[in-house]
């Protein structure tokens, strides 16, 4: 028996009360007998979960870091890895064939015989795998939300969203306690993953056109290498990451919350169109703030602290009631903030929000009503589902990946358009949500066109692209958008115009990358029409960059991306020229782009995007 164990090199230990597992990685592929049947491991996202115990760790027992909350079925028996995150991951891995998660490689596992010392303490033996597959764990007095993802090399790796425990410090002086908050960037856990989602799919359309335009030349290769860097998800600018590096000196390691204009920050966050005022109430975060700053109150829970932190960062105000529904609202709030800042955790937050909504069956009216204690909460949850839908479609369109939220995942066919009696300033936000939902449906159709573009006849593909182009033009020039801009103040109207134009041009560029014919095609007329539309779109985006203020650049990373995308399309258009030259108009556009990114470099000196842009412009202009 010991011989068989040494052959498989797999140790399995289970504790029924804690659902603990221990696995030692095999140096050889797992034998065929370890592969489980597909039906046995085919998890479903729509399963309801009952969390055993509180998500907040017991502060009196901080040394027991191996204790985590695990999924349990209705009867109370512990399930293997049944959490929304893990089931979403494994259900995708088993879609094409049965494969046991025993086959995966765990790089953080200690292997006997290596230079690492083998720890034989019982606590370490029992926590080998659970620390890698926990949905909520405690590390160094820090509460972590962890999940698993599959790397490009086929290995499961662990990722963490943020450290939410241990952020508070109390400086006792003369009998009074002073609440301080450690500098957020220093407490955030950056995503260390090197593999990004489906980058090759993002590059496919433009790469093919570029290669056909200037096949094999050194100039083309140099240009496309720079374009790949600028457009890759790995090199996208994350505003929060850059601000983190600006000043990390020791004298700024803590922040006195009482010195912040908390009320002003919250009120400003709730004024933003289509923001968190759709599904969160402003007075809820005010109550959390008062409870946190009042020395007579009990310590604030970790979950409430995360709500306050998010509200100060962007106004992510969450429901303080201890309901499952508020966990979904919290994740959508983080998702909104991640979209604005360009966080590389965005795909993980999308997946987490979707799996949480599915586990709570929020797409079903009866289940949604059961999860909410009032009609107001039910309406806010429906809005949050639609916000998740819109963000998912925009992300899928940008990186040409598959969309995770379908129309059947929504509780209603259209976003709720009725303002609640307690709401005052959400009417315009509701209008903006309705406008963006219409755009998201167009994105879904563009994605379907892109998926079938390779095997579809060019004539059918062009006809479908024309129909989608007309729908996009109708949306951009709709009466709803015009009327909404007239009802806004000047600054808000400018901000909304930028947002709608960015959505429009990003979808336009995606349609052009699909419908642009091969330069060697026998249909020069159609090709010329697409080229004219491409040039006009590039010109409008680049010349409009002077309307983007420095404040806007720090508030939304999409300002940077759309200008980067326009520059990349301009590089493609220059390479498509038969004489491989750079005309007068193109030189002028390149100069405007250089000025825009020079301004970005001044605002965000830690960013390397200006250097990359300068190198690309030099290649296009002088080589």
Swiss-Prot record:
Q: Report the domain of life of the source organism.
A: Eukaryota
Instruction: Provide the leader sequence positions.
Output: none
Induction annotation: Expression is up-regulated more than 10 fold in toxin producing cultures.
Which pathway, metabolic or otherwise, does it act in?
Mycotoxin biosynthesis
Q: Which UniProt keywords apply?
A: Virulence
Q: Where is this region: Disordered?
A: 110-129
CDD domains for this protein: fungal_TF_MHR (cd12148)
Q: What is this protein's function per UniProt?
A: Part of the gene clusters that mediate the biosynthesis of AM-toxins, host-selective toxins (HSTs) causing Alternaria blotch on apple, a worldwide distributed disease. AM-toxins are cyclic depsipeptides containing the 3 residues 2-hydroxy-isovaleric acid (2-HIV), dehydroalanine, L-alanine which are common for all 3 AM-toxins I to III. The fourth precursor is L-alpha-amino-methoxyphenyl-valeric acid (L-Amv) for AM-toxin I, L-alpha-amino-phenyl-valeric acid (L-Apv) for AM-toxin II, and L-alpha-amino-hydroxyphenyl-valeric acid (L-Ahv) for AM-toxin III.
Q: Additional info?
A: Gene clusters encoding host-selective toxins (HSTs) are localized on conditionally dispensable chromosomes (CDCs), also called supernumerary chromosomes, where they are present in multiple copies. The CDCs are not essential for saprophytic growth but controls host-selective pathogenicity.
Annotated protein name in UniProt: AM-toxin biosynthesis protein 12-2
Phylogenetic placement of the source organism: Eukaryota, Fungi, Dikarya, Ascomycota, Pezizomycotina
